Design a protein with these regions (language model features):
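C-terminal catalytic domain of photolyase/cryptochrome flavoproteins
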Residues: 1-170
Length: 170
């Protein structure tokens, strides 16, 4: 699917598929981006995913969606930053799939998740890794009681993302 999109709309390599999203005022905080890259967000599912990616060059699709959504919606960092990082790290990297999935996560793509869909990393953890097997595999010293606090509170980040998108699109 995304190969066809890329073939017919080559502009998606560097631009939003849906032009109306060009007005989103991304925060693009470099320190927050570094923490995301290093798996130091304070959200175990996001952190485990990024650590797995950095160590192996792989990440399960569900975790790719969670980490991508976190970067774009919780941190309001331009999807192109994350797309470039994944392109550099993924062993199974393929341009059209990487691009299309990042635009899906950011809400800017042809079949994107709506901008108001903001994954809760804690709910995703409970739903997909309730026994913490994945977390403990990639965060070796994981301890729920001493794990660092989230770099941004989910409720605040969700409301900020929805408000930012809504203001920009109206």
């Amino acid at each position: 699917f995304f190969m066809q999109i890329l073939y017919h709309f080559p502009k998606v390599v560097t631009n939003n598929f849906r032009k109306k999203y060009d007005v989103i005022p991304w925060r693009n905080n470099e320190e927050e981006f570094k923490k995301w890259c290093n798996g130091e967000t304070g959200y175990p599912m996001v952190d485990a995913g990024m650590r797995e990616l950095n160590k192996t060059g792989y990440m399960h699709n569900r975790v790719r969606m969670i980490t991508a959504g976190f970067l774009c919606k919780h941190l309001l960092i331009d999807w192109r930053w994350g797309e470039a990082y994944f392109a550099e790290k993924l062993l199974d990297y393929e341009l059209s799939a990487n691009n299309g999935n990042w635009q899906w996560a950011a809400g800017t793509g042809c079949d994107a998740a709506p901008y108001f869909r903001v994954f809760n990393p804690e709910s995703q953890l409970k739903k997909f890794d309730k026994d913490l097997k994945y977390i403990k595999k990639w965060i070796e010293d994981f301890d729920e009681l001493t794990y660092p606090n989230p770099m941004v509170e989910h409720k605040f980040a969700r409301e900020r993302a929805i408000s930012t998108y809504k203001k920009a699109l109206n």
